[in-house]
From Swiss-Prot:
Gene name of the encoded protein: WDR7
SUPFAM superfamilies found in the cross-reference section: Quinoprotein alcohol dehydrogenase-like, WD40 repeat-like
PROSITE patterns: WD_REPEATS_1, WD_REPEATS_2, WD_REPEATS_REGION
TM spans (from-to): none
Compositional bias annotation for Polar residues: 936-945
Lineage of origin: Eukaryota, Metazoa, Chordata, Craniata, Vertebrata
Phosphoserine modification, residue list: 935, 1456
Spans annotated as Disordered: 761-783, 911-945
Source organism: Homo sapiens
Protein name in UniProt: WD repeat-containing protein 7
The organism's place on the tree of life at top rank: Eukaryota
Keyword Phosphoprotein among UniProt keywords: yes
Keywords (A to Z) from UniProt: Phosphoprotein, Repeat, WD repeat
WD repeats: 17-56, 62-104, 156-199, 324-366, 404-443, 462-507, 558-597, 1351-1390, 1392-1432
Record's compositionally biased regions (Basic and acidic residues): 768-782
């Protein structure tokens, strides 16, 4: 899914808990979470309460093979990170608090054990992971980036390591790694902090190698209590060794011929050893094993038989002898919480966790009686105890009489074009149902609960037993008929269905086993094969079934082993089949002949050579874990391809690919705001359905449909401003004329979209209807079966209704809840909704049902939450208290959607959805019933205008139609519409600013600043605005102390840029020589393998990797992302809360120095401003760095830099080259008009248009924040430019310079300044006039006059224009008058007054110029020369001026001190060629005659 899409999963688990055959167990350091990995590749997080009660919280998807080991990966108490490894060599770093995957990698080797090791370098703590497995060394991996740093290697008899332990030495700085190889040789490596910090790949050899004759070693553990003993457990005996010289102290055989699988020290004198059938034994060690006793080592050297310790102390047994598929996994942990528990945790193949608390029993002198289990729970039990039961997607349609279990769904496919979900069930029936409607039934309460068999659906019956797979070929390739749906079952048959009529078209019975997979051949196969689908069955056969000819054109059935992979060589007409034994069969498709069968390396090469690998995950047939990664690369993600707007990398291979080249192109939008993906954790499980909501696509769809509604509201300025996404302070830049053009374009694109995507709304042209009828034979209409349009409803609004109802925090504000239910039409959830979280590389965490129920019976004063949610218990409270990442995503989604709905006309979910034909927006042909009347938008000052104001209410035909019956039809629609918008506004405000207070800080998990920072310039304007509002609200909420913490946390990641900022004029080659190493390579640093993943934007592109030099320049994704985030976060804090921001001349309350964050102080007064300088350097670097593949011209990070430079210009100004920055911004918006002219309503802007828009906004902000800086800088550039232009050599490229191309933009900003900051403009009026003269075409001014070309400047009384000889007079602050001659482009200055000039005016015949200054109270008359040559302007002679008269005038008093009236004190009006009136602002007149 595109780099930055905001995609939220909601999961419907169904009543049967997923299979979870546990293969690894871990207890986190804080003792609050148990982590289990299973053989199918999922990881489950279980909450453990202080009373040792367990509640399953989430299931993490991402591994494609069985989990082999788990380890903690972080030692700090605030971060709970774990690392997992699977059989296929994948390693993932997870955040336990919310299930996010932080980093992942894939190695060519399988780890069987990982140990975390932390050491200190100076004052920094570094984490390392020591991994061992099916390879003859120990790999040392960085715990944050998962990069392999170096390895510990054996010189003597290298072999696989079976287990390993780290011995920490408190006396010396050296730590020891002790490992046992498979052959029973003990290896010792010494690891020092110097070695650990080394970055080279030199291996480290062992210090010691000693055979200790321990075969089949299962575990090795170091005694933390005595710091002297080692326990080695082998399958048939266990032994204790002295850690000093590895001499044997004691040994114990296995009990009753059982096999030991592990052990650990319970205390200094007790060990616990467990067997493979789940029993555990505690032994008391003899005194000779205890360093504290006098007889320590007294038995060394005796025969092994004499070293057997006393009989076992306590026997622990499982209470119920369940039959298990494989041995349970047992581990011993001692927690370090307030209650110091020693826990034995065991997980088994049925997904059950058992816990024994050993602390209290270790002291009892007991005999062999069993110790009772403290707690035991399985996933299925956790599901069963919930009321209501966890819902499946079509439970209400799958009720079996006299059974409380519904029919299981065994195969599913979603058809996004129709919004239909097709579910195959275990009884052979197939149900087609509208996905949003059936999800609403399962998740939300409403009138649908009273109807049986709701929503209307269709059932196809044809298979005799379970349906195993479904395929909708048209979705994969448009070459297939869109009516056809293909199903395969356990009855060996493949059936073609017509989904429109519901009839069975054909049955293929060619296989001799159940159908396991249905595939689509690639595009470039032969014409005959193109109309086939490929079916794979469990009798090891593959068929090509032609949908056109209705026959099997080829059956390949000689394979001896199960089929693992199907590949294609269309060019050679080959079908390549890979089997589970490694053999490969090559079949000719046309003839059906077996071309060859090969094994070994040739087989591998053949498979690799098939370029056209059909994206069936390599082992999807043999391995049951159809996890998200595979789903994402298979048809299911041909399904999700719709969400993956324009970048879907091959996640199956985890290759990090860069598609920087794409970034400039406008992404292709699919319009699927909802995707339904069925996943199975195990082949035997029923389907779990995950609904993926793509927030951006949903917003686009809502706006697109809104734009297609033919009401004049579209042209209202409010909406246009919305369209331009202008959060600009400068007004809308779309004028009425362009709006009409835009409206036309919008209608065209909308028509296309609606035709394409809303077929079920039967709102199509007659042509489509006719076509549809022809396609679907006469019986299509006559047959009694309903057509596919089972229920007519608005798919987009339904999706929004479902999503918003699930996200809203119910029960916190009763008044708002009422508004949501009655006015907005949202529905309350039945029970807590299980959301998910997508993270990097298609990894996903899904909340298990009941995740928010406390695992404890009664702890910390929490009362047991009723299983049924009482009305008061807010369902939404659950999601905002889960984790910070979840809160961030949910708040972003709900605020951006609420803002979108608010900008629409009467966007309420109350409609006639439940009835058959709903009221529809009028067709384009129907005239609008009443023209929209806009009333001024009501303003709410929440979050200083960051939350959008309620849009002006607009009447449309639809608002009457949509009235729910409760209102009298006469109630004015205008009012309803206004109330609806106000409702959305309140909803957005509550989630943006009031949640922490309503929920209480103990429950509320605040949003993550860094996640919001990364969306500061999100591609989707609504999400961008929501992120900015949320981030600013959160920064305000945490107040100064919190902001200081954020700065301290992120400042170390801020890249240290060099001071040479590259001006746009400098070529990139020159730039490279200016910069200093190592930063020169910075922006190029490995951004190549940038990965556009599901969660974060390409904000990392182009960030330097130059963290403090003692660390190696890490190029890991996370590191680069942190740098980008640091720049944005510090930029926002600096810009919004930085040094005193006081716009000149406008008296605002100066910020008290205590409010300024440390590091962002003013340059004066000795305050600390280092951070402001570094942040400013980073921002200007990103703006001015020439475009390169590593930092594309319109990347998100560059756009963010533009935005922040504009926002915080007053903070950054002292440290930046203002001229370079302004020119850089002008360069970006030189073509803004062109870019922004062709935007389509609702769709995100193209990256180029977005950059132009941001640059334009930044320029307006800079100009209004510091008008003098802007005016003087641009005037200086203009002078420099004109001087260059005079130099003939550089003439040819003058018109291509930035300044020349951005003339329109400069004029736009000057106009804003004249409008908003007239006083500043008057102070520098001559410079402003210089800029205007440069930007306006001389010929145009001559033809039309200044008044028409640039009316704004003519408002000033100190500017006068004489049309006949094209002269402009401008009065300056220091008493001089500048005279411009437009024909020659020359300027001449005359000095005549001591103070600022108040007014100037040319006489009607142009012979005289009158100037007046209020300060020195003089009016002067100047005579223009009347010589013939001068008047013709020959010889470029400047006009001769002389002062012919000066009069004294009593001064005019301003109306009120300090007001703008100072600019309008008096004006000069010529009544004839010789008479002039000085008109004061209060109406007094003084007449003068020349």
């Amino acid at each position: 899914m595109a780099g930055n899409s905001l995609v939220l999963p909601i999961v419907l688990w169904g009543r049967k808990a997923p299979t979870h055959c546990i293969s690894a167990v871990l207890l986190t350091d804080d003792g609050a979470t148990i982590v289990t990995g299973c053989h199918d590749g999922q990881i489950c997080l279980w909450d453990l309460s202080v009373e040792l009660q367990i509640n399953p919280r989430a299931l993490l998807f991402g591994h494609t093979a069985s989990i082999t080991c788990l380890s903690k990966a972080c030692a700090s108490s605030d971060k709970q990170y774990i690392v997992s490894a699977s059989e296929s060599g994948e390693m993932c770093l997870w955040d336990v608090s919310d299930g996010r995957c932080i980093e992942f990698t894939k190695l060519a080797c399988t780890h069987t054990g990982i140990q975390f090791y932390q050491f200190s370098v100076g004052n920094q703590r570094e984490g390392r992971l020591l991994c061992h497995g099916h390879y003859p060394e120990i790999l040392v991996v960085d715990a944050t980036s998962l990069e392999v740093l170096y390895s510990l290697v054996s010189k003597i008899s290298p072999d696989w390591i079976s287990s390993m332990s780290i011995i920490r030495s408190h006396r010396t700085q050296e730590d020891t790694v002790v490992a046992l190889s498979v052959t029973g040789i003990l290896k010792v490596w010494i690891v020092t902090s110097e070695i650990s910090d080394m970055q080279d790949t030199e291996p480290i050899f062992e210090e010691e190698s000693k055979p200790i004759y321990c075969q089949n070693c299962q575990s090795i553990s170091f005694c933390a209590f005595t710091q002297r003993s080692l326990l080695v457990v082998c399958s048939k005996y266990w032994r204790v060794f002295d850690a000093g010289d590895y001499s044997l102290l004691c040994s114990g055989p296995s009990e009753n011929g059982q096999t030991w699988t592990g052990g650990d020290f319970v205390s200094s004198d007790k060990v616990i050893i467990w067997t493979e059938n789940g029993q555990s034994y505690i032994y008391k060690l003899p005194a000779s094993c205890l360093p504290a006793s006098d007889s320590f080592r007294s038995d060394v050297g005796k025969a092994v038989e004499n070293l057997i310790p006393p009989v076992q102390h306590i026997l622990l047994d499982r209470k119920d002898k369940e039959l298990l598929i494989c041995p349970p996994v047992t581990r011993f942990f001692y927690g370090c919480r307030e209650y110091f528990h020693k826990l034995l945790i065991q997980g088994d193949s049925s997904g059950r966790l058992n816990i024994w608390n050993i602390s209290d029993t270790a002291d009892k002198q007991g005999s062999e009686e069993g110790l009772a289990m403290t707690t035991s729970i399985s996933l299925q039990e956790a599901f069963d105890k919930l009321n209501p039961c966890p819902a499946g997607i079509i439970d209400q349609l799958s009720v079996i009489p006299n059974s409380n279990e519904p029919l299981k769904v065994t195969a599913s496919v979603y058809i996004p074009a129709h919004g239909r979900l097709v579910c195959g069930r275990e009884d052979g029936s197939i149900v087609i149902v509208p996905a949003t409607q059936t999800a609403i039934v399962q998740l939300l309460q409403g009138e649908h609960m009273l109807r049986r068999g709701w929503p209307p659906h269709r059932t196809l019956r044809g298979h005799r037993n379970k349906v195993t797979c479904l395929l909708y070929p048209h979705q994969v390739s448009a070459r297939y008929d869109q009516r056809y749906l293909i199903s395969g079952g356990v009855d060996f048959s493949v059936i073609i269905w017509d989904i429109f009529s519901g009839e069975m078209k054909h049955i293929f019975c060619v296989h001799g086993g159940e159908i396991t997979q249905l595939l689509v051949p690639p595009e470039n196969c032969s014409a005959r094969v193109q109309h086939c689908i490929c079916s794979v069955a469990s009798d090891h056969s593959v068929g090509l079934l032609s949908l056109r000819e209705k026959k099997c054109i080829m059956l390949a059935s000689r394979h001896l082993f199960p089929i693992q992979v199907i590949k294609w060589r269309p060019s050679d007409d080959y079908l390549v089949v890979g089997c589970s034994d490694g053999s490969v069969y090559v079949w000719q498709m046309d003839t059906g002949a077996l071309d060859r069968c090969v094994m070994g390396i040739t087989a591998v090469e053949i498979l690799n050579a098939c370029d056209e690998a059909v994206p069936a995950a390599v082992d999807s047939l043999s391995h049951p874990a159809v996890n998200l990664k595979q789903a994402m690369t298979r048809r299911s993600l041909a399904a999700l391809k719709n969400m993956a707007h324009h970048k879907l990398q091959t996640l199956a291979t985890n290759l990090l690919a860069s598609e920087a080249s794409d970034k400039g192109n406008l992404p292709k939008y699919s319009h699927n705001s909802l995707m339904v993906q069925a996943i199975k954790t195990n082949l035997t499980d029923p389907d779990i359905h995950v609904l993926f909501f793509d927030v951006e696509a949903l917003i686009i769809q809502l706006l697109t449909e809104e734009a297609s509604r033919p009401n004049t509201a579209l042209i209202s300025p409010e909406n246009l401003q919305k369209a331009s996404g202008s959060s600009d302070k400068g007004g809308s830049f779309l004028t009425g004329k362009r709006a009409a053009v835009l409206f036309q374009q919008v209608k065209e694109t909308i028509k296309e979209n609606i035709k394409e995507h809303l077929l079920d709304d039967e709102e199509e042209d007659e042509e489509i209807m006719r076509q549809r009828r022809e396609e679907s034979d006469p019986e299509y209409r006559s047959s009694k079966s309903k057509p596919l349009t089972l229920l007519e409803y608005n798919l987009t609004m339904d999706t929004a209704k479902l999503f918003m109802s699930c996200l809203h925090a119910w029960g916190l504000n009763e008044v708002l809840d009422e508004v949501c239910l009655d006015r907005l039409g949202m529905l309350k959830p039945h029970c807590t909704v299980s959301f998910g979280l997508l993270s990097r590389g298609g990894h996903m965490s899904l909340m298990l049902p009941g995740y928010n129920q406390p695992a404890c019976k009664l702890s910390h004063g929490k009362t047991e939450v009723g299983r049924k949610l009482p009305a008061s218990e807010g369902v939404g409270k659950g999601t905002y208290g889960v984790s910070r990442a979840v809160t961030t995503q949910h708040l972003l989604s709900i605020i951006s959607l609420a803002n979108t709905l608010m900008s629409m006309t009467n966007a309420t979910f109350i409609g006639d959805h439940m009835k058959k034909g709903p009221t529809r927006p009028p067709r384009p042909s129907t005239p609008d019933l009443s023209k929209a009347r806009g009333s001024p938008p009501t303003s709410s000052n929440i979050v200083q205008g960051q939350i959008k104001q309620v849009a002006a209410p607009v009447v449309s035909a639809r608002s009457d139609a949509d009235h729910s019956g409760s209102d009298p039809p006469s109630a004015p629609a205008l009012h309803t519409c206004f109330l609806v918008n106000e409702g959305w506004s309140q909803l957005a405000a509550m989630h943006c600013v009031m949640l922490p207070d309503l929920l209480g800080l103990d429950k509320f998990r605040p949003p993550l600043l860094e996640m919001l920072a990364r969306r500061w310039q999100d591609r989707c304007l609504e999400v961008r605005e929501a992120a900015q509002a949320l981030l600013l609200a959160e920064l305000r909420r945490i107040e100064q102390a919190g902001r200081k913490e954020a700065i301290d946390a992120w400042a170390p990641y801020l890249p240290q840029y060099i001071d040479h900022v590259i001006s746009p004029g400098v070529t990139s080659e020159a730039a490279q020589t200016i910069t200093t190493a190592p930063d020169a390579s910075g922006p190029e640093a490995k951004v190549q393998e940038e990965e556009h993943d599901l969660v974060d934007d390409d904000i990392t592109t182009g960030c330097l990797s130059s963290v403090p030099q003692m660390k190696k320049i890490s190029t890991s994704y996370e590191e680069r992302r942190k740098q980008a985030t640091a720049i944005v976060l510090l930029g926002v804090i600096g810009a919004e809360f930085g040094a005193e921001i006081e716009p000149p001349k406008l008296l605002t309350r100066p910020r008290s120095s205590s409010q300024i964050p440390e590091g962002f102080g003013l340059t004066s007064g000795g305050s600390n401003y280092s951070l402001a300088r570094h942040t400013c350097k980073a921002l200007t670097f990103l703006l001015l760095q020439p475009p390169s593949p590593k930092l594309p011209p319109h990347s998100t990070i560059r756009r963010t830099a533009i935005d922040l430079i504009g926002r915080g210009f007053t903070v950054w100004e002292p440290y930046m080259d203002v001229s370079a920055v302004l020119m850089g911004l002008l360069e970006l918006c030189a073509d803004a008009e062109k870019q922004l002219a062709n935007i389509t309503m609702g769709l995100p802007l193209s990256p180029a248009a977005d950059s132009a828009r941001s640059a334009r906004h930044a320029l307006s902000l800079i100009a209004t924040a510091r008008p003098p800086a802007f005016i003087t800088t641009i005037a200086k550039e203009v002078h420099r430019h004109t001087a260059l232009a005079a130099n003939t050599q550089s003439q040819q490229n003058m018109h291509t310079t930035t300044l020349a191309r951005a003339k329109g933009e400069i004029l736009r900003v000057i106009e804003i300044l004249i409008e908003k900051m007239p006083t500043d403009v008057v102070d520098l009026l001559v410079e402003v006039m210089d800029i205007i003269m440069y930007c306006l075409e001389g010929s145009l001014v001559k033809k039309k006059g200044l008044q028409e070309c640039f009316p704004a400047i003519c408002r000033f009384y100190m500017v006068s224009y004489y049309e006949r000889n094209h002269r402009i007079a401008v009065g300056a602050r220091h008493g001089s008058v500048a005279l411009y001659d437009i024909r020659t482009g020359k300027c001449q200055t005359i000095h005549g007054h001591k103070g600022p000039i108040t007014a100037v005016a040319f006489a009607p015949d142009g012979r005289y110029l009158a100037t007046y200054s209020n300060t020195d109270s003089h009016i002067s008359f100047w005579q223009m020369n009347t010589s013939l040559l001068g008047s013709i302007g020959m010889l470029n002679s400047a006009p001769q001026l002389r002062c012919i008269k000066t009069y004294q005038v009593p001064p005019v008093q301003p109306a009120s001190p300090g007001s703008h009236n100072a600019l309008k004190l008096a004006r000069l009006i010529w009544t004839s060629n010789r008479n002039v009136i000085l008109m004061a602002h209060d109406g007094k007149e003084h007449r003068f005659m020349v």
